[in-house]
Amino acid sequence: MDILSHIALVLVPGLGNASIRKLIGLYPDENLFALSKGDLETVFGRHKGIAECIANRSTFARAEQELTFCEKSHIRPLFFTDAAYPARLNRQETEDCPVLIYCLGDCDLNPERSVAVVGSRRATAQGRDNTCRMVRELAPWAPHIVSGLAYGIDSAAHTTALDHGLPTVAVLGHGLDRIYPTANRPLAKRILDNGGALVTEYTSGTAINPRYFPARNRIIAALSDATLVVEASEKSGSLITAAIAGSYQREVFALPGRVTDPYSKGTNRLIARNRALLVQDVRDIAFQMGWPIEEAPQTDAAKEAEHSLTEAEQQVIALLQEHERMTLDELTSHTGHTLAEMVSILFKIEMLGLVHTLPGHVYQVAHA
C-alpha cells in the first residue's frame, strides 16, 4: 500500500494500532482497500462497520487532505513498515504505539542512543538546574534527547540539548499545524533549525485536548532507551511516562529530592517503590546502560569531590588510574589498609561517583 492508503487505514474508526499491525502481518503484500467487501467481512467478522468503511474507501477524502497538508508543510508520514519509522516503536512490548506518525524535521529517529528527560511543568529553579546539568553531562555520549515541549522540565531539556549540540525530539499531543504551548513556538523553531524533530500521531486540525497528552507520553517512552524523571509531584504526568517506560522494559531513572519537597514526592515515590533507579549524576545512567564510562569527562560534581579527598582516598584513585581495574584484595594489599578501612574508602569514593563496582568486587575509576 502507498502512504495515502496507510493514512486512510489509520483513519478507519474502530481500527486500532495493534489490529493494524496484525492485519499487515496477515496481508503483507495486499492492499486492504482492494479486497472485496465479502473478504473484508470475513476478516473482521462481527465488526462489519470497519469492513464497510474500508470497502467504501470512506476515509480517503480525509486522507488526501492530510497528505496534501504534509506535502505542503514538509512533514514525513512514517508507517511502521517504513525504514525511517522508529525501530524502538516496533518492538513486541510496544505494539500499542502508533503505526503511523508524522515527523517534521530531518532528524534520524533511529539513533544509537536516546534518552527521555521529563518532569514537572511547574518546575522549581533547582529542577531546571538539575535538568540542565544532567543533559549537559550526557553530551559526551551524544544521545538524542526526547521530551514533550511542555513548560518546565521539558523546555529545559530541549533547550540544554540544543545548547550542547544534541539532537532533540519533541513529541506533541496534537497535530503539526499548531504548537502548544504557543509560548514555545520559538523553541520548536530552534529544534527544527538545529536538526531536531517534532513528532506526533495526530492529524492536522486535532484540537488541544488534555486526554491526548498521556497517550503522547507513550511515544516519548518508546522512542527512548531510558527515561529520566528529574522532578515530579505526586500527580505529575511524567509519572505516566515513567510507568509506560517500565512496561516497555526500558530503564527508568529518577533524581531524588527532599522528602518535604512537594515537587519531589513523585520522584521519591518512584525510587521507594523500585520503579526507578536513583541517580545523582549521568555516570549512574551510563553505568546502568553499559555506555563507555571511561570516554566521558568528569562531571562537575566529581571535579568538586576530588578536592575534598583524603590522602588515602587519593591513593586508591591513583592506583585505579594506573592499573585500570583492581580487586578489593589487590587494593588492600597495595595500600596496606585493613579490609574494613578499604571498604570504607571505596564506599565513599563510589558515592562521590569517582569509581564504579564491577562484578566480583572489582573496581574501576569512573573517568579516564
Spans of features found by a protein language model:
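Short, small/acidic-rich helices and loops at N termini and domain boundaries
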Residues: 1-84, 270, 352-354, 359-361, ...
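Glycine-biased, small-residue-rich flexible motifs in mid-sequence functional cores and linkers
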Residues: 2-3, 80-368
